[in-house]
């Protein structure tokens, strides 16, 4: 009973290890870490953007900070700007990846076209061999007559 429980636990840990070592789980973990760091960068950029570009407008409107707008509109504006920046950067990254994938697909297609079809090549070799054999047999028959 104890031995089977150990085997079950070993199977569980082995399955867990296999799950963790899958490429997509590791990729997801890396993406989460990079996403967190990128969010910090975007937040700092938006804070700078607010200070440099929007603060003069807010001062003229009599608002000291964007967060002071009624009904939490300032935080909503900041969240929308953060979202738009992050969405734009992700869009650019996806476009770059798609471009690289298209380029790779074209290169693979060119390589595939350059390589002869092994089945067709084998059929050609067999046909040539059969034709040589027929010629040899015909020559032997004609020389024996």
Curated annotation (Swiss-Prot):
It is a multi-pass membrane protein. One of its GO terms (molecular function) is mechanosensitive monoatomic ion channel activity. Its main location: membrane. Keywords: Cell inner membrane, Cell membrane, Ion channel, Ion transport, Membrane, Transmembrane, Transmembrane helix, Transport. InterPro entries: Mechanosensitive_channel_CS, MS_channel, MSC/AndL, MscL_channel. Pfam families: MscL. Coiled coil: none annotated. This is Large-conductance mechanosensitive channel. Belongs to the MscL family. One of its GO terms (biological process) is monoatomic ion transport. The chain crosses the membrane at residues 30-50, 74-94. The keyword Transmembrane helix applies. Homopentamer. GO terms for cellular component: membrane; plasma membrane.
């Amino acid at each position: 009973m104890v031995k089977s429980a150990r085997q079950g636990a070993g199977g569980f840990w082995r399955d867990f290890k296999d799950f963790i070592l899958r490429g997509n789980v590791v990729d997801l973990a890396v993406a989460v870490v990079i996403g967190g760091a990128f969010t910090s960068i975007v937040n700092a950029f938006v804070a700078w953007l607010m200070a440099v570009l929007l603060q003069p407008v807010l001062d003229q409107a009599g608002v000291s900070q964007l967060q002071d707008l009624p009904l939490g509109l300032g935080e909503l504006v900041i969240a929308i700007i953060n979202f738009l920046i992050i969405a734009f950067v992700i869009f650019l990254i996806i476009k770059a990846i798609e471009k690289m994938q298209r380029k790779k697909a074209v290169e693979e297609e060119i390589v595939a076209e350059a390589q002869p079809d092994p089945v067709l090549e084998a059929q050609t070799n067999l046909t040539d061999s059969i034709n040589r054999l027929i010629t040899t047999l015909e020559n032997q028959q004609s020389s024996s007559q």
